[in-house]
């Protein structure tokens, strides 16, 4: 039983040291100069156009029954999709769920191998 505790403690200490080493790594050098530029440029807002999201023809807030609303409906509703509905299963292989399945397999194999150390 004592040997198992030593292995667990050693593993936890190893992970802690590894985490501290990763957190303490120096940042990569940047190509930008360390001094501030001698001339400052004023910050300018982009001009508002009809293509900007959330703009209407007037300054008044649009009412729900108004034809001049900026958003057709709540995000994710059928009216907000229009002709651009949610994508099908064509990109399902590139989704995060596939990566989650791989990590679940790795965790399962690791737990089985780890059980041999304790039993």
UniProtKB/Swiss-Prot annotation:
Chain segments annotated as transmembrane: 99-118
Membrane-topology descriptor: Single-pass type I membrane protein
Bias (Low complexity): 24-42, 82-95
Entry annotated with the keyword Transport: no
Domain of life: Eukaryota
Gene Ontology cellular-component terms listed: membrane
Extracellular-side positions: 24-98
Tissue occurrence: Expressed in mature pollen grains, developing microspores and tapetal cells.
Signal peptide, first to last residue: 1-23
Compositionally biased intervals (Acidic residues): 56-69
Gene name, Swiss-Prot/TrEMBL: BCP1
Protein's name in the database: Anther-specific protein BCP1
Function summary: Required for pollen fertility and development. Active in both diploid tapetum and haploid microspores. Major pollen protein.
Keywords annotated in UniProt: Developmental protein, Membrane, Signal, Transmembrane, Transmembrane helix
Primary residence: membrane
Cytoplasmic side: 119
Region Disordered, residue ranges: 24-95
Subcellular location per the Swiss-Prot or TrEMBL entry: Membrane
